[in-house]
Amino acid sequence: MGARARMLQRLRGHAPAAPSTTLDALDARIDAHFTARRALGPLAPNERIAQFQRMLEAAHAEVICASAATWAADLAGRLAAAGVRNLLLDTACAEGQALKAALEAALPAAVQARGYTRPIEEWKAELFDTIDAGFTVARSGLAATGTLVVVPDANAPRTVSLVPPLHVALIHASTLHADLHAAVAAERWRDGMPTNLVMISGPSKTSDIQQTTAYGAHGPRALWVVVVTDEDRGTDGQQGAAA
């Protein structure tokens, strides 16, 4: 046995043995705390939306509430009015397809929808210089903090929500949770943790030593959040988000 192995053996021998029930007990205490807190002030679905909107707007994000039937056309008009000419989005998802169709139908020459189809090395300059906005779909949201839960993938990598000066995120109202604890439990994060889970609560901002706040230093300087009131998606998402 070498010196390293002997040292590790001594350390393990002196380490106190943790009771097998420690983690289970801690989980139970955490669950009880958050369950009791939510029981003191349960929020109806419309109240969760209102709280989510308040928290985001307090962080200088813009929130757009729209129906499942109108959000794409509404957003297309807003993008054109804001001077967006090149929009980066995931054309493989249903929401991306709907927005692309709305842009082509109403504003075929105003806003170009672009997909993330090439390695960044092949179009880095074009991406940083010409893309005005990125569109993503959040997996869920946290009403207590006004937070978007975004899981990047190959069609919509983190670059889409990080590089363009404007990030437009869509979230279905049925996926809003009361808080982080409720989201973790309802979506069973422990069963499949993603390698890159992003939580966004506003546009990128930073402050210097003089407490001067600047937006866009490390990411998008503006954030639009489209909340789709989508009762037609069924009850599964609503029940999961109600926890």
Where are these regions (language model features)?
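The feature marks the mature, well-folded catalytic cores of soluble enzymes
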Residues: 1-243
